[in-house]
Regions:
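Predominantly the C-terminal beta-signal and adjacent terminal strand-loop region
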Residues: 82-84, 138, 148, 154-197
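Short, aromatic- and cysteine-enriched interfacial helices/patches
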Residues: 24-30, 48-50, 170, 179
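Cleavable N-terminal export/targeting peptides
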Residues: 1-29
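Gram-negative (and chloroplast) outer-membrane scaffold detector with strong preference
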Residues: 23-30, 34-43, 59-133, 154, ...
């Protein structure tokens, strides 16, 4: 009897394992598009004598391919807004560019999905401003910027969903503020709509 119970338990475990594996390797290849609007906040450190406003409206658009129910790939364009600085130097610092990401998802229910993402992004940071009343000076820096994020999605229909995301973009710009763009992490909180074909 004990042997039969053990055999039944092993068979049940193998069935669950096979079912999970089938879900992971069951390709869906479903394309989708989306757009989000939110607020970006930079942690840039301003030198003495300069005051910085580090928050601004930000937005992004993207297209993706759902590989299976757990993994998707995304490519998009993002505008992380601008920081403004005043004092002995005055002007703006803005960051935008192309984004790529691998997105992992887990469905709590057919309507509610949790997500986590890791991205490699190609972002350009530009500073336009003046120093002590001199003529406008422009400085730019384009880098590979890594990002991480988490989010949630609520599906209104099988095709339309509402998405909330938090993302952090690490070390945008260059490390030197004077004569450069300054280096900063940028946090983005956004809400948007996604449409699945």
């Amino acid at each position: 009897m004990r042997t039969m119970h053990l055999a039944a338990a092993v068979a049940s475990a193998l069935t669950l394992s096979t079912s999970a594996s089938a879900g992971f390797f069951d390709l869906t290849l479903a394309p989708y598009v989306g757009g989000s609007l939110g607020q970006a906040t930079s942690d840039i450190s301003c030198p003495v004598g300069i005051s910085c406003d580090d928050s601004d409206t930000a937005w992004k658009i993207y297209g993706g391919l759902e590989i299976n129910e757990y993994i998707s790939m995304e490519v998009g364009y993002i505008d992380l807004g601008e920081s403004t600085f005043t004092g002995t130097q005055s002007g703006t610092r803005e960051t935008n560019g192309m984004t790529t990401a691998v997105v992992g998802t887990y469905a709590i229910s057919p309507s509610f999905i949790l997500s986590g993402r890791g991205g490699m992004n190609f972002l350009n940071t530009e500073v336009n401003g003046t120093i002590a009343g001199t003529s406008t000076q422009n400085t730019g820096d384009t880098d590979v910027v890594w990002s991480f994020g988490v989010g949630a999605q609520y599906n209104l229909t099988p095709a339309v969903g509402l998405r909330l995301d938090w993302e952090r973009f690490f070390e945008t710009g260059s490390s030197n503020f004077n004569g450069g763009t300054g280096e900063a992490d940028i946090d983005l909180f956004s809400a948007g709509v996604v449409y699945k074909f």
